[in-house]
């Protein structure tokens, strides 16, 4: 049995490592001191991730993503984990919940998220507030 990583997975990990070192690490100290990521930087990093094909690496091909196997996704996350979460999460993993979009929602919600044009968040209200999450 061959336990070596496929060469294309190694190349993805190397690409991600270079992205982290060149694009994310230089901003870590400033982001930590400011306790936020400036919008201009966020947009620039997202555009770079889209250009390199790293954005939405978790999405299947039929949703506009690369359709990477989980092992390749793990190798990408491993490299992104070398940077601050505040910066690494800009690379983007649109929520898989968007895959449940109805056909009429696909163009408006799912595809722009996969292309990096829309950013999504999930939030719950504070204690004692009504929520529909989980039922």
Over which residues does each language-model region extend?
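Juxtamembrane/interface motifs at transmembrane-helix termini
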Residues: 32-34, 96-97, 127-130
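Amphipathic, small/basic residue-rich leader segments at the start of a protein or domain
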Residues: 1-88, 103, 108, 112
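Glycine-rich, Trp-frequent "lid" loop and neighboring beta-strands that shape
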Residues: 65-66, 103-135
């Amino acid at each position: 049995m061959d336990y070596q990583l496929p060469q294309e997975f190694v190349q993805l990990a190397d690409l991600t490592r270079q992205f982290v070192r060149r694009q994310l690490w230089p901003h870590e100290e400033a982001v930590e001191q400011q306790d936020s990521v400036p919008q201009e930087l966020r947009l620039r990093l997202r555009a770079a991730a889209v250009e390199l094909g790293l954005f939405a690496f978790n999405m299947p091909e039929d949703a506009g993503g690369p359709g990477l196997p989980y092992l390749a996704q793990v190798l990408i996350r491993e490299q992104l984990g070398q940077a601050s979460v505040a910066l690494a999460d800009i690379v983007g993993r649109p929520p898989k919940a968007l895959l449940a979009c109805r056909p009429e929602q696909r163009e408006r919600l799912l595809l722009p998220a996969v292309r990096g044009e829309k950013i999504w968040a999930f939030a719950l209200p504070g204690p004692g507030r009504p929520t529909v999450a989980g039922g």
